[in-house]
Amino acid sequence: MFCNVRLELDLPFAHSLKEKRRTVRSLKDRLRRKNVSVVESSNQDFWQRATLELSLAAVSLGAAEEKREEVRRMLVNYDEIMIADLREEFVKL
């Protein structure tokens, strides 16, 4: 079971591309520590917007939902970002 998530983020505290990259890099590092694959897919040139694509794998739907909820809690509690849009999709192979 795979879970794919597309995040549209607002970065209200970023005042330059350098600050945005620092924030996004920190967020990506935290997600990778939770065994989540992550890539910044668009909005690279906008300093207060970011679009991230996340993917995680699990052995069952229940485990994927649990991991996804853990990631969602971490994102909500991350002070430097605001979630503008979140789309998720579960894929069973």
Task: Give, region by region, the residue ranges found by the protein language model.
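Beta-strand elements of well-folded, non-transmembrane domains
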Residues: 9-13, 56-58
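A short linear hydrophobic-aromatic micro-motif
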Residues: 34-42, 84-85
